[in-house]
Amino acid sequence: MNDSQYNLIAEALLLAIEEAIEDSGVDIDYEGVGGLLTLTFKNNSKVIINKQAPLHEIWVATKFNGHHFVLNNDSWTDKRSGEEFWQFLSNAVSTQAETELTLSAQ
């Protein structure tokens, strides 16, 4: 994958996250600026998702730890655990929002 392809795919992922948050019906504020998406919850905790263009990765920081995701066969997966991005994000957001929700690209 070249840099242009990465940027298109990563920007599409960030947009899909915004849409999934909006569609969830849960009160989560989000702000996207320049490849960085910040989710802010009622309890003032945050999840920060950002592009790491030089590495062709997506980084996610929760209040607990950080994760690096790489694109493998059209699916973003955690470099350490192998967990799929949307499953991870659903769990992280559910924990920080203190309510169960499932996010996905639609």
Curated annotation (Swiss-Prot):
Family: Belongs to the frataxin family.
Keyword Metal-binding on entry: yes
Alphabetically ordered keywords of this record: Iron, Metal-binding
Gene responsible for this protein: cyaY
Cited Pfam families: Frataxin_Cyay
Keyword Aminoacyl-tRNA synthetase: no
InterPro entries from the UniProt entry: CyaY, Frataxin/CyaY, Frataxin/CyaY_sf, Frataxin_CS
Protein's recorded name: Iron-sulfur cluster assembly protein CyaY
